[in-house]
């Protein structure tokens, strides 16, 4: 479940560990053992670094001022200011990840962890970290909140240390030259081969002592679209070259399967991932939508980090994982007079202390290596027991214990002091009031949003078409009563300047049709514009996703296909969020026509002659129009108020003229003792001549449970509708059993105020992981009385 989060973390080289109960499954000795084994393997061939030729250097700078500013920034980046001797700061850190299956759906918090600590650093003694508060919540799986057994390596960032990487790239230690194995640093020596530089805006401000600080922007664009390259806006102090603020993002998203193929080819490795694995876990992408960094001036001289944040998303097959890391720092003093105790030096590694020879382990026999492995494990067990005894002795005398370790490739020795009662960390008054609070003031959200505006459509990688990528898999495969079995191939190519092209040919067997899409897109990492042509099978349903893989399983296995379909071909211009949700719009011109049922085959049909329901008779015509949709989630705390809103509007003219709009709202609230309740209210109205394929339908898992969609039953289809749903549930670990009652109506808009008897149903269900999966056993009340079982994804509650 956490693979998508880890994929995104890998994309920008951040180590994010989320433990659900229990202790870490690795010790220092096991790490030494792993490193030792790794030393025994053949090293892969290194990725070649592009040399900076005179031609590349000449084309790297738009003007001489950009060249001069980059040179100054490089020197400042590696220069250590010996005048900065110490600081005393409070550090806040928050890491959040969500999880969903649809581009449009409720924002679900998969996990959130946060901590606050006092960090005192001195050039002579390293960093002393007093952990003041720490807590983790996993609201989708209640009772698994992990607030104990804190790992000091995962706690509290260090605001500054000699050699710190100012741009938050890599392992935290600045490298003077570009490393082609990592994200290519835009300020490192040799970056001219990968980037182009231009001077941007400039600003200045006056300090209280009358000193004027001048800042200048350096706009950096990669020469080609590649996930290892970033686009960004970087501001520097003109007098010193120190970084003051920055905003950057990946130039394009990371296609993880493409990266795997590239690494396999680089290593001359024939052991490629099986095609079946790719099909099951595709697509697999990660996108770093934006990193913002803000520095503050302290003592009139020292630029120190004040706030930094990274935001992105990952997709692994059907899973969508938005991700955010936020850090902020507040300084009580800089170059204060407080003294810090000396931190003990790092102990000698077990490998060196036990076998202090220079012999490479590949040069010794297999029997000798096995003997050494066992000796390392035994020595590590002894060391671990000694550490436990020392910790117990500290807790018995002071109520706190201190652990010592090295961070950032041994650059900084760190002492972390924390209370022995780990539950006290979760109750700390130093933490924000609620872990579910957005933290606008704490993490400087307004300033971050202002910085992100610089990453607009004008800041893009250069024009350099890349090799196309090919994607197939379960997410492109479906089954329904019109197409039968249908699958497609997704072909994409990055062109540069923010442009890309995408083709998706699709074949279906039952109706013997060839459909497809051809689109050109332009994006800036957060928003995307698409222009293209298409020939599609469309679903009329406003709720649920009848053409998804999950709905296809119901159709294939149980003969249950709740979608109503029609065909269309045309062209459209659309705008959307890259990560899904939020505000989307679409301008279209298309021809629509009927899509008759072409197959009755399903497993239920083969075993018990279960028949699919008939499809609607679509009205043929050509129209042009516009539609918009906006979804938003307010609140993340399952025990507090949460509101999911989904609003839609559409208008078209041509063969038939119409306008339609709908609003869907679900309000939920924890009632205490693990009980939760939710109420849904939804309604839609239309004007003009609404064709059958754009009407509303009542019945099914996403509207009134206990009733199947119907084109003939009263109150189940029309040019207006209303819907109400109520649920009461009790939360257990990962599962929320519920009881529910649904009522709704669809019909002629003139009958809105006197609809007659509405459609209704009631039942019991189970919501897994806060509605990510859902199973309902329902009983129809009106018009049909029958018992139905529904299994589906992405429920409202």
Describe each PLM feature range.
Residues 226-229, 476-487, 494-498, 503-516, ...:
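Solvent-exposed loop/turn segments connecting transmembrane beta-strands
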Residues 628, 764-772, 786-797:
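Outer-membrane beta-barrel "beta-signal"
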Residues 90, 245, 500-504, 528-532, ...:
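Residue-level detector of the transmembrane beta-barrel scaffold of outer-membrane proteins
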């Amino acid at each position: 479940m956490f693979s998508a989060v880890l994929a995104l973390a890998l994309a920008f080289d951040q180590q994010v560990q989320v433990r659900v109960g229990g202790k870490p499954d690795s010790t220092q000795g096991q790490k030494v053992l792993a490193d030792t084994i790794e030393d025994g393997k053949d090293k892969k061939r290194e990725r070649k670094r592009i040399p900076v030729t005179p031609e590349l250097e000449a084309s790297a700078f738009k003007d001489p001022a950009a060249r001069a500013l980059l040179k100054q920034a490089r020197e400042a980046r590696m220069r250590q200011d010996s005048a900065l001797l110490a600081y005393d700061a409070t550090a806040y850190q928050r890491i959040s990840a969500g999880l969903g299956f649809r581009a449009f759906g409720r924002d679900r918090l998969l996990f959130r962890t946060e901590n606050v600590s006092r960090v005192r650093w001195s050039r002579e003694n390293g960093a002393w970290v007093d952990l003041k508060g720490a807590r983790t919540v996993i609201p989708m799986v209640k009772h698994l909140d992990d607030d104990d057994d804190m790992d000091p390596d995962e706690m509290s960032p260090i605001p500054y240390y000699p050699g710190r990487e100012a741009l938050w790239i890599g392992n935290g230690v600045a490298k003077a030259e570009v490393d082609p194995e990592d994200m290519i640093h835009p300020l490192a020596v040799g970056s001219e081969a990968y980037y182009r530089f231009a001077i941007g805006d400039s600003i200045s401000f006056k300090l209280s002592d009358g000193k004027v600080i001048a800042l200048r922007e350096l706009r950096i664009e990669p020469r080609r679209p590649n996930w290892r390259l970033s686009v960004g806006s970087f501001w520097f102090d003109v007098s010193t070259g120190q970084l003051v603020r920055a905003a950057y993002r990946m130039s394009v998203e990371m296609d993880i399967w493409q990266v795997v193929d590239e690494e396999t080819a680089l290593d001359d490795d024939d052991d490629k991932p099986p095609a079946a694995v790719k099909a099951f876990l595709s697509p697999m992408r990660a996108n770093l939508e934006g990193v913002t960094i803000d520095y503050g001036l302290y003592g009139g001289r020292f630029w120190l980090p004040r706030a930094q944040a990274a935001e992105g998303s990952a997709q692994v097959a059907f899973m969508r994982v938005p991700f955010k890391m936020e850090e902020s720092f507040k300084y009580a003093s800089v170059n204060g007079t407080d003294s810090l105790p000396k931190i003990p030096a790092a102990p000698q590694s077990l490998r060196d202390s036990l076998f202090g020879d220079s012999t490479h382990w590949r040069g010794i026999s297999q029997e000798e290596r096995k003997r050494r492995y066992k000796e390392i494990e035994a020595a590590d067990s002894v060391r671990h027991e000694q550490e436990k005894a020392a910790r117990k002795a500290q807790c018995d005398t002071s109520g706190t214990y201190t652990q010592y370790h090295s961070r950032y490739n041994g650059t900084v020795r760190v002492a972390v002091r924390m209370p022995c009662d780990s539950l006290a960390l979760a109750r700390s008054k130093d933490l924000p009031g609620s872990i579910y609070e957005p933290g606008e003031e704490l993490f400087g959200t307004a300033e971050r949003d202002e910085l992100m505006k610089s990453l607009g459509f004008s800041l893009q990688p250069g024009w350099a078409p890349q090799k196309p990528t090919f994607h197939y898999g379960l997410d492109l495969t479906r089954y329904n009563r019109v197409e039968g079995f249908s699958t497609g191939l997704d072909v994409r190519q990055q062109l540069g300047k923010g442009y890309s092209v995408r083709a998706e040919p699709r074949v279906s067997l039952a109706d013997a049709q060839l459909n497809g899409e051809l689109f050109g897109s332009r994006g800036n990492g957060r928003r995307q514009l698409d222009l293209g042509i298409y020939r599609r099978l469309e679903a009329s349903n406003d709720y649920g996703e009848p053409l998804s893989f999950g709905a296809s399983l119901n159709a294939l296995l149980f003969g249950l296909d709740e979608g109503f379909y029609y065909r269309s071909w045309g062209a459209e211009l659309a705008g959307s969020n890259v990560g899904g949700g939020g505000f989307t719009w679409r301008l279209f011109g298309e021809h629509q026509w009927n899509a008759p049922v072409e197959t009755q085959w399903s497993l239920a049909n083969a075993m018990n002659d279960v028949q699919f329901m008939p499809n609607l008779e679509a009205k043929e015509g050509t129209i042009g129009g516009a539609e918009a949709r906006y979804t938003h989630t307010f609140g993340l705390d399952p025990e507090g108020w949460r509101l999911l809103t989904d609003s839609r509007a559409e208008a078209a003219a041509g063969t038939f003229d119409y306008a339609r709009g709908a609003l869907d709202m679900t309000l939920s609230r924890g009632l205490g003792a693990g009980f939760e309740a939710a109420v849904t209210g939804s309604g839609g109205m239309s004007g003009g001549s609404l064709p059958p394929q754009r009407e509303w339908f009542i019945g099914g898992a996403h509207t009134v449970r206990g009733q199947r969609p119907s084109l003939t039953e009263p109150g189940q289809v029309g040019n207006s509708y209303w819907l109400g749903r109520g649920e009461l549930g009790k939360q257990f670990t990962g599962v929320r059993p519920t009881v529910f009652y649904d009522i709704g109506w669809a019909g002629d808009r003139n009958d809105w105020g006197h609809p007659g008897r509405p459609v209704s149903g009631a039942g019991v269900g189970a919501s897994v992981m806060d509605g990510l999966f859902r199973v309902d056993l329902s009983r129809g009340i009106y018009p049909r009385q029958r018992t139905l079982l529904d299994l589906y994804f992405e429920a409202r509650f």
